[in-house]
From Swiss-Prot:
Gene behind this protein: DPYD
Cofactor info, note text: Binds 2 FAD. Binds 2 FMN.
Annotated GO CC locations: cytoplasm; cytosol
Lineage of the organism: Eukaryota, Metazoa, Chordata, Craniata, Vertebrata
Protein name: Dihydropyrimidine dehydrogenase [NADP(+)]
Chain positions recorded as substrate binding sites: N609, N668, L669, S670, N736, T737
Pathway per the UniProt entry: Amino-acid biosynthesis; beta-alanine biosynthesis
Record: residues binding FMN: S550, K574, T575, K709, G767, T793, G794, G795, C816, S817
Organism of origin: Pongo abelii (Sumatran orangutan)
């Protein structure tokens, strides 16, 4: 009997065992069975788990805010980029948060990092440790929505980490005169005490201002202050701190370790005698605030302050911090941590990594009064730390030279808000180790004496002006913890930033110079910012290739003026006509597209408009063009004009536009709606003969360049472009919007619907949804007409997409929908992004990057994961019993490394230098054309197959489903582990990669065996090719 071809074979049926099927009846399964099922598939922590995960010597990143590229892009695209954004008002260092998030969403990670470091020299550190819920995130407008606020800290960390991986040094402000031509004031000697966040920030800004003799004196043999010694490695790695210090040193700042502010070493008086013109004190609060009940207790007895414990942990876990490797403190048994701030929680989670069996966090007040950020508390809770509120320490019990317990009394708050201690309610807790985290003070008399003659306040701290950070001694400034204003790293950074300007102002005054009334601190610069992105086209010099399309952003010339002020290189006017052809628009007329699905707000992938050309007169536009060219001679202004098929009309309007001073003309022969009914726009642009003649008329009328704007609503756009060239056009714009009907409501009415009758017409679709159409138009024109100038438009919303059009053969880039999604300031992102993309092409070490995206490492939740198959010849997913196995294997490996005294190697910063010339815009135009051709030119011998990275796989089975119901049934899906496996029947179609939610979890690799198609029925004749 002949086999039934339309039924799956037995082996395929086996593969399809877990493939979704439509439900025909309710499913029955007992509660007890479902409880077992739940345990098998569980990914989050089990509430009934009493065994703490072994964390000894595990200093891997534990932050919930950490993001990989996939997560960062999704989060950045979710951001609204609000007007007058509240998040920015809540940031101590005044970061332009919405702008750096815009850059991340556009995959311009350098642009984001530049924006961050410009206002915060410790931008990576702050991205990791900032208490964002109390700061920027607390003001996020998305708190008013179901999905909640943006993970700003995670985005900041991601962008700055990518820049760190670029290994590009900071450079001196390029707008400053050469050092030898700077005034004498900039050679003034400046001293800073303490190499912590406040001093690093202050020194960085002073160096950016141009000061060349800046020295930081640090008491310890390591740098970074509390960022190094007290914030644990799993929250802030040492190589991050070192990276930011190296950025500062790129500007010539010197650091001398082993020198402290003390009467025994250096004082303000001796500093002044040595010729220092200004000093900044940023030494923090070096001594612990120790309760009287702990006097006389030692580490050997099991007592630590946070100032003792955390530096010991840091030295044992932070590779590169010290010259020699130090062991972690050995903590065993039960630990009591006293305090409820971030430091207390750092002590608790660090104790677990030093071997503690159980950790109790004890504090005087209730949960609602905990000062630590919620993330820190949540992490401690997840690691099974216990919380004991309303307890005040009374006595430490010592037996046999070791701490064995502590006594506490209960605290209560009365109706007036006052806290009282109830001696009748005693609590006795057994413990082996006690860690006090009750804050820090400045109590060393030698340090205070060294600060003489500055005044101190009633808290024993230097008295400063909170605006200028100036002490009672005009030449001495202070900031950070030591002055008591800053409570966080980011606030310390801002203290140093604030002080830098007023130090600058003070020094200049000492040399008889003045500074601007409004502070103007320089931005962060690298060699990327020096890249030239100007380009010439049709004899015109464009300062950058980005301009306004003839559309809504150019509705008026005052808008064009604002665009030029923002940095746009050129602009087209909105299309205008002779007065006899003037139009009046309908409303509504511009609507969001349906191509983004139910995603509302910015970032729309398409818009549809039924807007006609400008309602303003030709006289308005011509006078305005004259004004713009007078005020912006370096910017290109292109007048966009439209007439019916009438030689006299085209001649008249073209001459008027040329006489106005326009640099060039764009002939709108492609408006897809409305104007065609008047014999204009599309009515002319779809016929090569009409296009050729109109171009000839305009060529006869004017001397300036002109470009024909092409419509994609034709069968062969090249024939239209060729006709324009034959008619004398200097180039073409490709393309205008695509004619379409965006959507219908459930009652059959369209949107937009005009008037009571709710009628509509086909409109023009714009945005990233039409980018594939625009890319085809540009490449096909560039291939057919080599060297013929092309102005690209259609879905350009970033430097990355702009580069695609340059590679396709365009010379300049017109933007509309991206501005509708945001505002004119996106130009800054586009320019820095394009400069970075060009610069990175010259770095040999980064050739495996895709633009600004680093090569993907195996990760889960944005964090690198150890390859279990390398530690144990076994593949394990990350859920249920397999997750527990993974944790056990990792824990055993961490302990093995500790026992073998294997320390992680310190990361050394090696700056990458270009090995080849940085390409110009001209160099990259048309680069992609060599790869385009006919299907017949493609190889059907060089085949690929899919390869899955099991460590990155989240076991969703999307690859399995699409292969089953849209492909070749070439993926097996394990019923227990949900790990997919590619079979040898894979044809390399790439559908699996296309639907996979994890970037680079699936890759296509070369097929090692010949590809033999499954024909179903044997061929009856030999194929001809």
């Amino acid at each position: 009997m002949a086999p039934v071809l339309s039924k799956d074979s037995a082996d395929i049926e086996s593969i399809l065992a877990l493939n979704p099927r439509t439900q025909t009846h309710a499913t029955l399964r007992s509660t007890s069975a479902k409880k077992l099922d739940k345990k098998h598939w569980k990914r989050n922590p089990d509430k009934n788990c009493f065994n703490c995960e072994k964390l000894e010597n595990n200093f891997d990143d534990i932050k919930h805010t950490t993001l990989g590229e996939r997560g960062a892009l999704r989060e950045a695209m979710r951001c609204l980029k609000c007007a007058d954004a509240p998040c920015q008002k809540s940031c101590p260092t005044n970061l332009d948060i919405k702008s750096f998030i815009t850059s991340i969403a556009n995959k311009n990670y350098y642009g984001a990092a530049k924006m961050i470091f410009s206002d915060n020299p410790l931008g990576l550190t702050c991205g990791m440790v900032c208490p964002t819920p109390d700061l920027c995130v607390g003001g996020c407008n998305l708190y008013a929505t179901e999905e909640g606020p943006i993970n700003i800290g995670g985005l900041q960390q991601f962008a700055t980490e990518v820049f760190k991986a670029m290994s590009i040094p900071q450079i001196r402000n390029p707008f400053l005169p050469p050092p030898e031509k700077m005034s004498e004031a900039y050679s003034a000697k400046i001293a800073l005490f303490g190499a912590g966040p406040a001093s690093i920030s202050c020194a960085s800004f002073l160096a950016r201002l141009g000061y060349s003799d800046i020295t930081i004196f640090e008491k310890q043999e390591y740098v970074g202050g509390l960022s190094t010694s007290e914030i644990p490695q799993f929250r802030l790695p040492y190589d991050v701190v070192n990276f930011e210090i190296e950025l500062m040193k790129d500007l010539g700042v010197k650091i001398i370790c082993g020198k402290s502010l003390s009467v025994n070493e250096m004082t303000l008086s001796t500093l002044k005698e040595k010729g220092y013109k200004a000093a900044f004190i940023g030494i923090g609060l070096p001594e612990p605030n120790k309760d009287a009940i702990f006097q006389g207790l030692t580490q050997d007895q099991g007592f630590y302050t946070s100032k003792d414990f955390l530096p010991l942990v840091a030295k044992g876990s932070k590779a590169g911090m010290c010259a020699c490797h130090s062991p972690l403190p050995s903590i065993r048994g039960v630990v009591i941590v006293l305090g409820a701030g971030d430091t207390a929680f750092d002590c608790a989670t660090s104790a677990l990594r030093c071997g503690a069996r159980r950790v109790f966090i004890v504090f005087r007040k209730g949960f609602v009064n905990i000062r630590a950020v919620p993330e820190e508390m949540e992490l401690a809770k997840e690691e099974k730390c216990e919380f004991l509120p309303f307890l005040s320490p009374r006595k430490v019990i010592v037996k046999g030279g070791r701490i064995v317990a502590m006594q506490f009394v209960r605290t209560e708050q009365d109706e007036t808000g006052k806290w009282n201690e109830d001696e009748d309610q005693m609590v006795h807790l057994k413990a082996d180790v006690v860690i006090s985290a009750f804050g820090s003070v400045l109590s060393d008399p030698k340090v205070k004496e060294a600060m003489s003659p500055i005044k101190f306040n009633r808290w024993g701290l230097p008295e400063v002006d909170p605006e200028t950070m100036q002490t009672s001694e005009a030449w001495v400034f202070a900031g950070g913890d030591v002055v008591g204003l800053a409570n966080t790293t980011v606030e310390s950074v801002n203290d140093g930033k604030q002080a830098s300007w007023y130090i600058h102002k003070y020094i200049q005054s000492q040399y008889g110079a003045s500074v601007s009334a409004k502070p103007e601190l320089p931005l962060f610069y690298t060699a990327i910012d020096l890249v030239d992105i100007s380009v010439e086209m049709a004899g015109l010099k464009f300062i950058n290739p980005f301009g306004l399309a003839s559309a809504t952003p150019a509705t008026s010339t005052s808008m064009i003026r604002r665009a030029f002020e923002a940095g746009w290189g050129f602009a087209l006017t909105k299309t205008f006509s002779l007065d006899k052809d003037i139009v009046t628009n309908v409303s509504p007329r511009i609507v969001r597209g349906t191509t983004s699905g139910p995603m509302y707000g910015p970032g729309q992938s398409s818009f549809l408009n039924i807007e006609l050309i400008s309602e303003k007169t030709a006289a308005y536009w011509c006078q305005s063009v004259t004004e713009l060219k007078a005020d912006f001679p370096d910017n290109i202004v292109i007048a966009s004009i439209m007439c019916s098929y009438n030689k006299n009309d085209w001649t008249e309007l073209a001459k008027k536009s040329e006489d106005s001073g326009a640099d060039a003309l764009e002939l709108n022969l492609s408006c897809p709606h409305g104007m065609g009914e008047r014999g204009m726009g599309l009515a002319c642009g779809q016929d090569p003969e009409l296009v050729r003649n109109i171009c000839r008329w305009v060529r006869q009328a004017v001397q300036i360049p002109f470009f024909a704007k092409l419509t994609p609503n034709v069968t062969d756009i090249v024939s239209i472009a060729r006709a324009a060239k034959e008619g004398g056009a200097n180039g073409v714009t490709a393309t205008n919007t695509v004619s379409g009907l965006m959507g219908l409501k459930s009652d059959g009415t369209p949107w937009p619907a005009v008037g009571i009758a709710k009628r509509t017409t086909y409109g023009g679709v714009s945005g990233t949804a039409i980018r594939p159409i625009a890319l085809r138009a540009v490449t096909s024109t560039a291939r057919a007409l080599p060297g013929f100038p092309i102005l690209a438009t259609g879905g350009i919303d970033s430097a990355e997409s702009g580069l695609q059009f340059l590679h396709s053969g365009a010379s300049v880039l017109q933007v509309c929908s991206a501005i509708q999604n945001q505002d004119f300031t996106v130009i800054e992102d586009y320019c820095t992004g394009l400069k970075a993309l060009l610069y990175l092409k010259s770095i040999e070490e980064l050739q495996d990057w895709d633009g600004q995206s680093p090569a993907t490492v195996s990760h889960q939740k944005g964090k690198p994961v150890p390859r279990i198959a390398e530690l144990m010849d076994k593949k394990l997913p990350s859920f249920g019993p397999y997750l527990e196995q993974r944790k056990k294997i990792i824990a055993e490996n961490k302990i093995r490394l500790k026992e073998q005294n294997i320390a992680s190697s310190p990361h050394k910063r090696n700056c990458f230098i270009p090995k080849r010339p940085v390409p110009t815009i001209k160099d990259v135009i048309g680069k992609a054309l060599q790869y385009l051709g006919t299907f017949g030119e493609l190889s059907n011998v060089e085949q690929v197959v899919a390869m899955i990275d099991e460590e990155m796989c989240i076991n969703c089975g999307k690859c399995y489903m699409t292969c089953n119901d849209s492909g070749y049934q070439a993926i097996q899906f394990d019923p227990e582990t949900h790990l997919p496996t590619i079979t040898d029947t894979c044809t390399g179609c790439t559908l699996c990669l296309s639907v996979c939610p994890i970037v680079d979890c699936i890759k296509m690799v070369s097929r090692t065996t010949p590809y033999e198609p499954k024909r179903g029925v044997p061929l009856s004749v030999n194929p001809v090719c």
